[in-house]
Amino acid sequence: MITIDGSMGEGGGQILRTALALSIITGKPFRIINIRARRSNPGLQPQHLASVMAAARISNAKVDGAYKGSLSLTFEPGDVKCGDYSIDIGTAGSISLVLQTLLPVLAVVNCGEVTLDITGGTDVPKAPPIDYVRFVLAHNLSLMGVGIKVELIRRGHYPRGGGKVKVTVKPAGRLKPINITELGELKGIWGLSHAVRLPSHVAVRQAKAAEDYLSKLGLKPSISLEYYEQGKDPHLGPGSGITLWAESTNGQRIGADSLGERGKPAEDVGREAAEALAAVINAGAAFDDHMGDMLIPFLALAEGRSEYTVVNLTSHLSTNISIVKLFLNANIETMNYNKKVKVTINPITAPRKP
């Protein structure tokens, strides 16, 4: 059984999420200790438990230690159970983070099209917003042959949650590698600024701040607005945020986002997202840093060698590489490349569950 120190590297829930996915795919059981040991609220929290229980349902796994605050967990996967699933995180726990566990599995198992109905948080701190999944991650996974459709039914913000998302995944069968080491020419920049249970001007100001910042750099984004009339807002809220993305002539998308919070001016929210997107564009990296670490488990399972660049070698990227190497006999290297970081992945096909 593989043993993982949950305090390694970035020491967060990503270690568990990646391990769950690769355990199901390879059939290798694991035990993780010191789960989130260096966090202010150590151990498993509700959104981590949601990932564990969803992974266990899909794989008929035997699980020990799945309770709030648990510092260790044993996971022994069985056979993958194909079908559609409803998952209720039960809090404002991030839907996007639960998807980080499930998407690699559904991308490669022979289950045909699978639909997930997930309730929880769509726009919450320390997690990719659902718009990043919809407009950036789903697009980039399509380059590998994975079909993902994300339908946002209702947003859920911290602390009330209540967001609803329907995700349909059509597996690739065999994942295609990605070889993109430069950003390339931009086809366009788009965005979505939203505000729920808040005045419409919040969404407008977020968008304008992002547009103003990018315009000074010679970039012309097209940012859509999402807000609701008082009395016709179906969300629990309140909350706001903005997601920006750019598509390259090389085919890939880069993204950036910022979340509103009490006392934070809407202008700061919009500008933060614009600054983050501009940093990737100025560096000429093929992918933003968040996408860079998300791609690791997928490309480690792909049919062939992959190369791509990111702006920085983050702790999340290094940690994901370490976890992948525990489950897959893949050769993954990082190196400095034209003031960027190049990631090279040479997969050695691992056994896959039917």
From Swiss-Prot:
GO terms for molecular function: ATP binding; RNA-3'-phosphate cyclase activity. The active site is at residue 316. Keywords: ATP-binding, Cytoplasm, Ligase, Nucleotide-binding. SUPFAM superfamilies: EPT/RTPC-like (SSF55205), RNA 3'-terminal phosphate cyclase, RPTC, insert domain (SSF52913). Its EC number is 6.5.1.4. The keyword Glycosyltransferase does not apply. This is RNA 3'-terminal phosphate cyclase. ATP binds at residues 100, 290-293. It catalyses: a 3'-end 3'-phospho-ribonucleotide-RNA + ATP = a 3'-end 2',3'-cyclophospho-ribonucleotide-RNA + AMP + diphosphate. It is found in: Cytoplasm. The keyword Ligase applies. It comes from Caldivirga maquilingensis (strain ATCC 700844 / DSM 13496 / JCM 10307 / IC-167). Catalyzes the conversion of 3'-phosphate to a 2',3'-cyclic phosphodiester at the end of RNA. The mechanism of action of the enzyme occurs in 3 steps: (A) adenylation of the enzyme by ATP; (B) transfer of adenylate to an RNA-N3'P to produce RNA-N3'PP5'A; (C) and attack of the adjacent 2'-hydroxyl on the 3'-phosphorus in the diester linkage to produce the cyclic end product. The biological role of this enzyme is unknown but it is likely to function in some aspects of cellular RNA processing. GO terms for cellular component: cytoplasm. Disulfide bonds: none annotated. GO terms for biological process: RNA processing. Belongs to the RNA 3'-terminal cyclase family. Type 1 subfamily.
